[in-house]
């Protein structure tokens, strides 16, 4: 029977009992921590849909709990309000009694009362007693009401804490649900594999800790057994000595027994009998000590056998856990490979789409030239930056004569409005296509250098920046960077020609002479 995932904590799946669940991509969810053979069963893996469904179930359960807690909070608030009203009513009643008594006692006496002080004191005494009797019952009721109110207040605070914790867990569950919904199928598979690997590693760590504890106990028990063995050897030697002395005295008693009835010669017999009895007691005590030591030794030996059996079982569990880790690692590697292949496919599709766009906008010839530049950049080393700059400047001067300043400023206006998140997306796609690592942060430097050209007219800082990156990461990175500029911004025909000219200057200067023809300039 499969174990359902109730929730995730720190990336590790747990069931509704709080136990870690190990889910192999080619096996069943397993919350028991046992099993063998590396979990190579033929049942289906936990799919991303199941993970997503679990997240939704967890959110729904928390919302249900939240509603139940809200109902309990409402009931507690009503109980508290009722207790408070009861307490306040009793408090007011008690105040009324006291005020009535004080009003009665504060009445000014008549002349006759002044003449009869004894009668007045009696009335006051009777009034005080009545007041005490009248107050006693409401005071007890008020104390009970106050206790009920405090209990209701305590319960209200406890429910508030429960609600706050449920709200926190609900937010985490909702965030997890949203995050899972945003993942691709391959990315979810990677996440499942990562969580399964983490769970398997956690299980192995627990087993290793258990084995270490058992080994410590085994070492201690063996030490105790050795000590008891030495003690037993000593006790047996003492028993043998006591037995020998007893036998010696027993033989003497037997030898002297014929004289036992002779008053003149019976004394040696009775002395030997007394000594034999004492030696018998000593021998019995030594036997008890030997028996007790043997019992302890047997207990320790039994404990050692139990520990050794537990270690054997733990080692079997460890072998299973290691096998699961290997399977989880293999599954993770497979999932990561599938994800990478999917990303590369997406990148290739995006790149092909990019070339198709180039074909539609600038013709097949330009698209073909762009592909040739990309292919030539693979593994190519940077050429002399001054030579590249000189070749580019020559091409640029010819190009500038064909375009107005407004046309030339289009590239600067486009880069000033660039959205770096779009650029980063294209940069990542082209980088995967050429199998290199792309960093959009480097693009900020390039954009900054290009924007400065509008004011300075100096292209050398840009070429030095590109040269440095080409030296560090290869010419392919320059291609990736500039292709992402072409894909992510609208540069105008002059901008397209300039970017292409930069690429040709670094990769193939001979193509500088064909750019205008290819673009139809």
From Swiss-Prot:
It is a multi-pass membrane protein. One of its GO terms (biological process) is killing of cells of another organism. Pfam families: Colicin (PF01024). It is found in: Cell membrane. Disulfide bonds: none annotated. The chain crosses the membrane at residues 470-486, 493-509. It comes from the Bacteria. Keywords: Antibiotic, Antimicrobial, Bacteriocin, Cell membrane, Membrane, Plasmid, Transmembrane, Transmembrane helix. One of its GO terms (molecular function) is pore-forming activity. Residues 26-52, 127-163 are annotated as: Disordered. Residues 133-145 have a biased composition (Basic residues). Residues 146-163 have a biased composition (Basic and acidic residues). Its main location: membrane. SUPFAM superfamilies: Colicin (SSF56837). Residues 30-42 have a biased composition (Gly residues). GO terms for cellular component: plasma membrane. Belongs to the channel forming colicin family. This colicin is a channel-forming colicin. This class of transmembrane toxins depolarize the cytoplasmic membrane, leading to dissipation of cellular energy. This is Colicin-E1*. It comes from Shigella sonnei. The gene is cea.
């Amino acid at each position: 029977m499969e174990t359902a995932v109730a929730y995730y904590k720190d990336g590790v799946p747990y069931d509704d009992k709080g136990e870690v669940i190990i889910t192999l991509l080619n096996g069943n969810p397993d919350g028991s921590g046992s099993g063998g053979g590396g979990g190579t069963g033929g049942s289906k893996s936990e799919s991303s849909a199941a993970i997503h469904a679990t997240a939704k179930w967890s959110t729904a359960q928390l919302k249900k709990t939240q509603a139940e807690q809200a109902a309990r909070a409402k009931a507690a608030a009503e109980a508290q309000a009722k207790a408070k009203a009861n307490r306040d009513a009793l408090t007011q009643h008690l105040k009324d009694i006291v005020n009535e008594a004080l009003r009665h006692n504060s009445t000014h006496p008549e002349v006759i009362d002044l003449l009869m002080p004894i009668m007045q004191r009696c009335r006051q005494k009777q009034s005080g007693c009545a007041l005490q009797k009248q107050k006693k019952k409401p005071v007890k009721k008020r104390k009970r009401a106050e206790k009920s109110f405090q209990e209701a207040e305590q319960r209200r605070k406890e429910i508030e804490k429960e609600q706050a914790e449920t709200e926190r867990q609900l937010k985490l569950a909702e965030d997890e649900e949203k995050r899972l919904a945003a993942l691709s199928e391959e990315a979810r598979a990677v996440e499942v594999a990562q969580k399964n690997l983490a769970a398997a590693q956690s299980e192995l760590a627990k087993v290793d800790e258990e084995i270490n504890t058992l080994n410590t106990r085994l070492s201690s028990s063996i030490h105790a057994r050795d000590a008891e063995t030495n003690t037993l050897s000593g006790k047996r030697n003492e028993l043998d000595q006591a037995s020998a002395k007893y036998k010696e005295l027993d033989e003497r008693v037997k030898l002297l027994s014929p004289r036992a009835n002779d008053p003149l010669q019976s004394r040696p017999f009775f002395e030997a009998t007394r000594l034999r009895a004492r030696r018998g007691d000593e021998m019995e005590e030594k036997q008890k000590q030997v028996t007790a030591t043997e019992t302890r030794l047997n207990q320790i030996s039994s404990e050692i056998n139990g520990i050794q059996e537990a270690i054997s079982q733990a080692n079997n569990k460890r072998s299973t856990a290691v096998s699961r880790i290997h399977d989880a690692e293999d599954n993770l590697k497979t999932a990561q490979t599938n994800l990478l292949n999917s990303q590369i496919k997406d990148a290739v599709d995006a790149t092909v789409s990019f070339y198709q766009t180039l074909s539609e906008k600038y013709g097949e010839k330009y698209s073909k030239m762009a592909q040739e530049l990309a292919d030539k950049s693979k593994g190519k080393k940077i050429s002399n930056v001054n030579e590249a700059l000189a070749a580019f400047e020559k091409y640029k001067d010819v190009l500038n004569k064909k375009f107005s300043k407004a046309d030339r400023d289009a590239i600067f206006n486009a880069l000033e409005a660039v959205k770096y998140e779009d650029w980063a997306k294209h940069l990542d796609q082209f980088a995967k296509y050429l199998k290199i690592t792309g960093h959009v942060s480097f693009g900020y430097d390039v954009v900054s250098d290009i924007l400065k050209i509008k004011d300075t007219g100096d292209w050398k800082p840009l070429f030095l920046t590109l040269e440095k990156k080409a030296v560090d990461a290869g010419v392919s990175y320059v291609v990736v960077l500039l292709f992402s500029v072409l894909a992510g911004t609208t540069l105008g025909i002059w901008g397209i020609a300039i970017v292409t000219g930069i690429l040709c200057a670094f990769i193939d200067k001979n193509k500088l002479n064909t750019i205008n023809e290819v673009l139809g300039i």
